[in-house]
Design a protein with these regions (language model features):
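Terminal amphipathic alpha-helical/low-complexity segments used for targeting or macromolecular assembly
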Residues: 1-54, 60, 105
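Structural signal for interior beta-strand "rungs" in well-ordered beta-sheet cores
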Residues: 37-153
Length: 153
């Protein structure tokens, strides 16, 4: 069986991968210089993401879109946050958050799926295997585990 990928194509692909990795490292180094603690080379942060000093970003975390992470947050490991605001002191552990606003000092996860238009107030806990969509959670609300809450206030 012949190799159907030319040497020139492989060289071009390697060049693109090297450029992408250099851009990723530049973004990580900018955040580290601003006081963000980044725990791993497996972290991916999009250019438009804002992270306050003192936040901790753990291994396997992906931050995309217009995401804002507050001071003192712990994000990860293995967390995806896209187009969302995470206020100060919030922990998001091994979860996914899309188009939502997590208030201060929340505890999210593990394995929680926060879908669009979820808004949490101070001190909310969304436990293991919780899924939310288009819902508001008042100060101190707790959802322990294995729960779906959607289209509610």
């Amino acid at each position: 069986m012949e190799n159907c990928v030319s040497s020139a194509a492989l060289d071009a692909a390697r060049t693109r991968l090297d450029a992408a990795e250099a851009a990723r490292e530049t973004i990580l180094l900018q955040h580290i210089a601003n006081g963000v603690i980044i725990d791993s080379r497996t972290v991916q942060i999009a250019p438009d993401v804002q992270i306050a000093p003192g936040a901790v970003i753990l291994a396997g975390t992906i931050l995309r879109g217009h995401t804002i992470i507050g001071a003192g947050c712990i994000i990860g490991p293995n967390t995806l946050i896209e187009d969302s605001i995470v206020d100060e002191g919030t922990t998001v552990n091994a979860s996914q958050v899309y188009g939502s606003h997590l208030g201060p000092h929340n505890n999210i996860g593990p394995f929680t799926h926060v879908r669009v238009n979820t808004v949490t107030d101070y001190g909310v806990h969304l436990g293991a295997y919780v899924e939310t969509k288009n819902s508001n959670f008042a100060r101190g609300n707790t959802v322990s585990h294995l729960t779906y809450i959607g289209d509610s206030d």
